[in-house]
Amino acid sequence: MRDHFLGVGKRAFSLLVMEGRMGKIFPAMVVLAFALVSLVGYESRAGGETNLVRVAEMQKTLRDLWLGHIFTIQHVVLYNTTNNQAERYIADKQVLANAKQIADTFTPFYGEARSEKLFTLLSDHYAAVKDYSEATIGGNTQRQDAALTHLASNADDIDAFFTGVNPDHLPKDTIRGLIAAHGAHHVLQINQYKKKEYAKLEETWPMMRQHVYIIADTLTTALSKQFPDKFS
């Protein structure tokens, strides 16, 4: 049974599955993704300032890191479900290391202090997800509700952070909706693990992956517009 749980994550994380199975994606997400790609390309052609290679490198970096975010958290959820404390401890450290890497990506743009603030916010996001996972396993609905409230307030905080550092290109509520939907995906996955809905889990993964790609692309586009000199 443990191998079946773990296999969901490993198969989902393989390049073959990642590239070959797109799953069911919300139409709005598809539209947004194409809009973001078009926007970056248009600015490069029109302004002549943005180097598409450097933008693509940043996009790949952020996509890989956000993919790592959902992959490592999935394993925390798995090990919570199977009550494997040793593996859960390792996975927990991996989640936080990944959050630090995401935050550090923004250090050249916003400085060390703001990078540390972002790390705190991402860690808080994870704490809410972990709380919901543990509450779901224990059947504690009151704790589940508290975790959902925590996720929602954290989405507001992450949105406020990015609006604060990049108000022109990430205005209020731009990031909040993306992070809120991302949190809902974690919740969905946790409940599917709890119910042992393996087929649904494999459908959920491509949706989660595509959504974190949209988060990464949104941040990449905003950075390239705010700091064209760093992408020239």
What are these regions (language model features)?
Residues E19-M29:
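Bacterial N-terminal signal peptides that target proteins for export
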Residues T204-S232:
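A cross-kingdom marker for long, charged
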Residues V30-S38:
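Bacterial N-terminal signal peptides
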Residues R63, A181, H185-L188, W205-P206, ...:
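Surface-exposed extracytoplasmic segments
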Residues L39-E49:
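Bacterial Sec-dependent signal peptides at the C-terminal "C-region" and cleavage site
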Residues I73-T163, H211:
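Alpha-helical segments in soluble extracytoplasmic regions
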Residues G68, E116-I137, H169-E197:
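Long, amphipathic, charge-rich alpha-helical segments that form helical bundles/coiled-coils
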Residues D3-H4:
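Intrinsic-disorder-associated, low-complexity terminal segments enriched in Asp/Asn/His/Tyr and depleted
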